[in-house]
Each structure stands twice: as structure tokens, then as C-alpha cells.
Amino acid sequence: MGGKMGSVPEQNTEKLLWQSSDVADSRDSKFRCCSWRALYEAPAKLYALGHSDRRKLYFSIKMGIALALCSFVIFLKEPLQDASKFAVWAILTVVLIFEYYVGATLVKGFNRALGTMLAGGLALGVAQLSVLAGEFEEVIIVICIFLAGFGASYLKLYASMKPYEYAFRVFKLTYCIVLVSGNNSRDFLSTAYYRILLIGLGATICLLVNVFLFPIWAGEDLHKLVAKNFKNVANSLEGCVNGYLQCVEYERIPSKILTYQASDDPLYSGYRSAVQSTSQEDSLLDFAIWEPPHGPYKTFNHPWKNYVKLSGAVRHCAFTVMAMHGCILSEIQASPEKRHVFSNELRRVGNEGAKVLRLFGEKVEKMEKLSLSLGEILKDVQRAAEALQMKIDSKSYLLVNSESWAAIKEQAEAEEARENDQEAKDDETKVIKSLSQIWDTNNNNNHQSNDQSQHWMSTESMMLKNREMWPSMSFIDGTVVNEIECKVYESASSLSLATFASLLIEFVARLQNIVNAFEELSTKAGFKDAVDQIPKV
């Protein structure tokens, strides 16, 4: 009996052990499955990476060639027999300064050379001073290292020294290595000499390989990025206008849009890419100004800054497109009937504005001047904006509270009637008229005033019948929303339409900045004369 009683916990223990082993086996099998799947998919992903942009493959090949050449030169015993122990600096130089773009390699090479030369010269001077100090040699070296580290780090924080940040790092590294290693070997001069020599060797190999073997230019990418921004903003502009007129509504706004992250929404991704390209443009600009003349950029001082300036003008227009997209995402929306009233004018402004952006994008991409005058370029879109303004002026009663508008209209008519009565009394003192004539005149004026008031109120009543965006009564959590709140919501919905229209007109006004920036760029960069003025729509 005791044996049977003791077997129960043993069976439970064995059962738990079997269950835990099953769980562990399942986890191991899932891990192995994921590992094999990752290994299986890795070659395909690597192939897709190189196939999508062959320049990435070229960059990797060039890096391998540069390292191989550097190692081959170091292995030659005759010319660099005494420098074999410093060979690592040549390889480190290739690894550190070989960059994707030619301009980036030139920038890093210049910074590394500048930092090495300054640190080597200063370290040799400090070394000679420390030797003269005798027994205080190490104290002098430590103090000088502290002063050099403090001074270089402090100067690096100065705003104008930001482009030379890498030079400061190389300076501190070279300065410390020359002093410390030279103090151990008692040969400061050879340490500085071979370090500078091998760094120069590595930098030379990097520049030759990067410039003459499948070069990748930052200026070319900057040029393409600016042209791409035009097309992206044009697509977003057309999409926003068409979406607003089609009463596009989001069932649930994506969280990525609310947090301003990358999203697949074409309306959102178009203007976002133009707005987010600021940092990329600045980086490409810093590299492009170092690059030698190449391809269509045949001048040493090519106006790369004007490309960034032109892109800034496009970005200024993209902000209005962003605000228009915000109107689509807004909770308070104008009724489809009111949007339909202004649909033709809104669509025309959107199409003409996108047409202008695409035209400038093509001209920037082809590096062509405009064959038309600057005033004619914006003529159609400005006329469309004027037509929209006139339509808003003629239909402005749709964009305000109807009762307030009617009250203002009645007050204006009453004031006009009082002015007419006052003028009639003044004329009575100057011109003698019969009482019957005065009576007939007053009756006619009052009758016309009443007819106008009745005509206005009938028009207003027809409008009130057509408005169905906001109900007169609604229920929220079992409570009745009063009529005042409904009128407030109705007025707000009308104002959203006015906001969208005003943003579109503001977009047209900002196009002039693009025209001015493009004219300046085309003049400085020497764009060729235009061949065809018909843009692709």
C-alpha cells in the first residue's frame, strides 16, 4: 500500500518532465525551422539587394580591390622593408576613409591627412621638448597629451569646425600614438614618418580605386533627389484634391500617419519624402562640393547649393499639401453637396499646379531652361486660382452660418431703406413735389425691398433643404444634442471647405518661389536651351 501511495507523485513528476521536454523540443524545432528559413532566404535577399541597385555591388567590389592592393604593396619587402611593423596603418586608412561616394572619400581623406600632418608635426616638437626635460620627460608628455586632448575636443564643439570633426579625432589618435610609442622606442621621427607615409599610401589607393573604377557621385544623386521631389509633391497634390472632391474617408487613420512614420499611403508618402529629404540633401551637398567635374557637371564650382535651395522651395509648397491632407484626415468634414459646388475650380487648380511641378521636375532632370517666359509658366494656374477665388466670393454664403448671414442681410437692407428715407426727406426741402408722388415713391421702394428680401430668404430656404451633413438632432450616449451644437458643427464643416480652398490658393502663391529658384539655378549651372515645352501629365 505504501509503495502504491509513493508511486503517485513519481508518476506526476515523470508526466511533468515529459511535458517540459515536449515544450523544449517544440521550441527547439521552431528555432531550427526559423534558422533554416533565414539561411534559405538570405541568398535571395542578398541577390535582390545587388539587383535593385548595382552600385552597392560595385562599392563592395571596389572595397575588396582597395584592401587587396594595399596588402600587396605592403608585402613588397624592398621599398617598405623597415615599415612592415607600421603596415596596419595603411589598411586602417583604407577601411576608415573608403566611402560609398567619391566626395565622401575625398572629405575623409582630406580630414585624415590634415589631422595626421598637424598631429605628427606637433608631436615631434613636444617629443624634442620632453627629451630636453630629462627626468621630467614623462611628466611633460602626459601634460602635453592632456592639453592636446582638451584643446582638440573643445575646438571640435565650435559650430564652424563641424566639417573637420574627423580630422580632430585623427589628430588626437596620431598625437598620442606618436608620443607614447616613440617614447618606448626612443625613435619619434621614424614613427611619425612611417605613419604619415603609410596613411598617404592607403589614402592614395582609396582615391584611385574610388574615382576611376565605377565611380559613384553624390552630386548625381542630389540632382536626381531634387527632381524626384517635384514629382512626389505633384502626385500628392493631385491625390489630395481628387480625394477631397470624392469625399474619401478613412475608417481608421493609420497609426504611422498619426506619428509621422513611413507609410504606404500614396498621398502621405509623396509629400513626406520631400519633407524628410532635408538631412539627405545636406549630406549629399557636403560630399558633392568636394567632387571634381564629371558628366554633365563640367564646372569646378558647380552650384550644388542652388539645388538644395530649389528643393527647399518645393518643400515650402509641400507643407501646404500636408495641410490639405490634414483636411482629409479631419473629423469635421464639409458636406458632399458643398464640395460639388466648388469641384470644377478646385480640380482645375490642382491639375494646373501639378502640371507646373512636373514641368519643373523634368527641366531639372534634363538640365534644360524654360522656353516660355516666367510669367507664362504660371499663367494657367494663376487664372485657375483667380476663378476659384471668384467662385468663393460669389458662393460665400455657403461657407458661413446661414442664420447669421440672413440676419446681416436683413440689417443691411434695413439700413439701406433708412438711408433712402433720409434722402427722400432731404430732397423734399429742395424740390417741391406733390404728396402723391412722394407716397408712390416710398411705396415702390418698400415694395422692391420686400421683394429682394423674399427672394433672398427663398434662396436661403432652398439651401437649408439641401444641407444634410449635420442632422438637426442626434443622440450621443442617450443624450440629445441641442440645436445650437448642431449649428456649431455645421459652421465648422463649412469652414473646413474654406480652409482647403485657401490652402490650395496659398500653394499657387508659393509657386513663385520655385520659379525664382529655378531661374537662378539654370543660370548658374548653365542649363541648355529647351527643346520641348510639353510636360508629361
Curated annotation (Swiss-Prot):
Residues 373-435 form a coiled coil. Keywords: Coiled coil, Endoplasmic reticulum, Ion channel, Ion transport, Membrane, Transmembrane, Transmembrane helix, Transport. It is a multi-pass membrane protein. It is found in: Endoplasmic reticulum membrane. The chain crosses the membrane at residues 56-76, 86-106, 109-129, 131-151, 196-216. InterPro entries: ALMT. One of its GO terms (biological process) is monoatomic ion transmembrane transport. GO terms for cellular component: endoplasmic reticulum membrane. Its main location: endoplasmic reticulum. Malate transporter. Belongs to the aromatic acid exporter (TC 2.A.85) family. This is Aluminum-activated malate transporter 5. It comes from Arabidopsis thaliana. The gene is ALMT5.
